[in-house]
Amino acid sequence: MSKVLKYDGVVIGAGHNGMICAAYLGKSGKRILVVEKNMEVGGGLDSHEDRNYPGFWHNIHSVFHRGLLMLPWYQDLGLEKFGIHYYKPDPGVVHHFLDKTYLGWFADVDRTVSTISRFSKKDAVTFKEIWRRWQPVVKQIVFPETYAPPLVMEQKRTLLEKSSVGREYLKFFNTTPEQFILEHFEDPRVQAFIGFLGVMRGYELDGSNTGYLIPAMIAWGVNPQLCRGTSHALGDNLAHMLSHNGIDYIEANGVERILVHDGRAQGVVLDDGTVVHARNFVASNVNPVETFIRLVGRENLDSQFGELAAGFRFSKTTPIFATNLALNERPKYITEEQHPEVIGSFMHIVGLETYTELRNLFEDCRTGQLPRKPFMNGATPSYHDATQAPPGKATAFMWQLAPYNLWGNPQNWDKVRGEWFKRQLAMWRHYAPNLTEENILSTDSATPLDIERHDRNMYCGDWMIGEYTGDQALENRPFPGWSQYRTPIEGLYLCGSSCHPGGNITGGPGYNAAGIIAGDLGLDLWWKPLDFREYLLNLS
C-alpha cells in the first residue's frame, strides 16, 4: 500500500523560487511540503566537487548573483542568520581584447566611463547620461515591478504616462535591446560589451518590447557577487531556513503526477508512489510544459490552454556549453601587465571583438549551427573565495552560448563535445596563455543537452526557463491572460522562472506567487507585498 502524507500545501521543485514561496506560506501558519527530485535542493544553485581532484569545486549553473542582500525575500526571511556570505569583487566585469585593452564595469560609474572613453568619448558621455537619467527609473519602477505581479500593459501605460520617470520608462519600451544599443553607441566593441552583458542576463537582442532593459541594466549596474562556499551554499541556506521554520522538504523523490479531481489540484503522487494530499494548494516551480503536459496531463486541460502550455517557447540563445577547469594556478590574462586592476575582476569576457560577432552567434544558435567563433564569459571563483580550491590552486570556468538543437538533433552534442571543448579552450588560451597542459589538472564540460539531462526544468538547456520577449514577458509570462501565478486548475499555481519576472536568481517569481496564494487563501500577511497599481498612482 502506498504511503500517504497530508499537508496544507505542496511546492514542486526546491529551486530558490520554490523554497522562497514555501517559506512565506509556511511562516503564515500553513503546513508545507517541498518536493525535490534531485539529490539536493537548490535547482540552478547546484555545485559539484571535481570528479578527479577533491577540493576543487565547480559552480554548475548560477554563479553571478546581483544585489541579493537587498532583495525583499532575503530580508523578510532573515537569511543572514543562517551564515550566508557574499563577496563583491570590483571590477565586476572585464571584457578583454586581443590588443591588450579592455572594457570594465566598476562599482564606481566614473571608472566604468573611463574605460569606455578609451574607445569612444561619445559613447562614454552617452553611457554616463543614460546611467544618470535611468537611476530613478530603476529605483522607482523597474525594481518595484520585479517584486509585484505584473499589470496589464494598457493599465500600466496610463499610470506611467502621468509621471516623468514613467514616461522615461515608456520611451524605450517598444524597442528591442539591439535597437537601443545601435542607436546609442557607435564603437563596435562598446556595442559588443553592452550587448553581451544583456545577452548573459537572458535578453534576446531582437526581443520585442524589451529595449528598456538595456538602459535599466546600465543604471542598475552589472556588479555580480559571489557566494562563499559555491552557489550551492545559498541553496543550503534556504533549506536551513525552511527547517528552522518547521517547513518540510523531501530530496531525491520527484513528482510523478499532480492529482486533479473535478478541476481542482488535490495533491501529488511522488516517484516512489507516495501520495501527498494538499488541502489548500499545489505550487509548481517547474516550467509550464513539465507542469501541464507531463504532471497535470492534457486530459485535465481544455484544448485552448493545452495548446498554450505545449507552445511555451524556450530560448534558443541562452543554452551554454560550460568548460570547468581545476588548475595549478589561476588564468593570467594578457591585459594584466598593462592594466593590473583587471586581475580582481569577477567576470571575464574573452573572444568577442565586435558586435557583428555577437549577432552572428544569435543566428548560429537559432539555426542550430556550431558558433562560427567561440567567445565566452566566465570567472576564477577561487581567486575571490579560497574555499573553492585547495591552497595555492585554482578553479576557473567559461560559458559559451551554443544551440541546443545542434544540426537539428541535440544528440549531436555527444559526438562533438570533445572537438568543441578543444576549440573553446584554444580561444581562452589566446587571452590567458598560461592555460597550458601542465597547468590544467582536470577538465569537465557540460553541453546544452547535458544541462537538460541534469535539470529537466531547463528544457532545451534554457536556464532562463522560457524565452524572454514581449509576448512572453511581464503580463504575458508565461501566457497572455495567465500572468498572476494562477492556472485554470483551481488550487494549482506557478511559482517558478517561467513566470514574471523570469529567470536568474531574483526570487521574484516565488515571492510574488506567495503573495497571490496567501491572498487567495485569506491569510493574514506578515510581510508587505507591493500593490504596484496603487504604487504607480502615488508615483504620479
Model-predicted segments: where are they?
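Mid-domain catalytic core of redox enzymes
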Residues: L226, E256-A389
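Extreme N-terminal leader/targeting segments of oxidoreductases
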Residues: M1-G9, K27-S28, A473, L523-S540
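Flavin-binding catalytic cores
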Residues: R330-P331, C365-R372, W413-R453
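A conserved FAD-binding loop/helix module that cradles the flavin
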Residues: S497-A518
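Rossmann-like flavin
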Residues: L98-G207
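Helical element adjacent to the flavin cofactor pocket in flavoenzyme catalytic cores
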Residues: I214-A265, V269
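A glycine-rich dinucleotide-binding beta-alpha-beta segment and adjacent secondary-structure elements
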Residues: D187-R201, P371-A379, N434-H500
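N-terminal glycine-rich phosphate/pyrophosphate-binding loop and immediately adjacent elements
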Residues: K3-F143
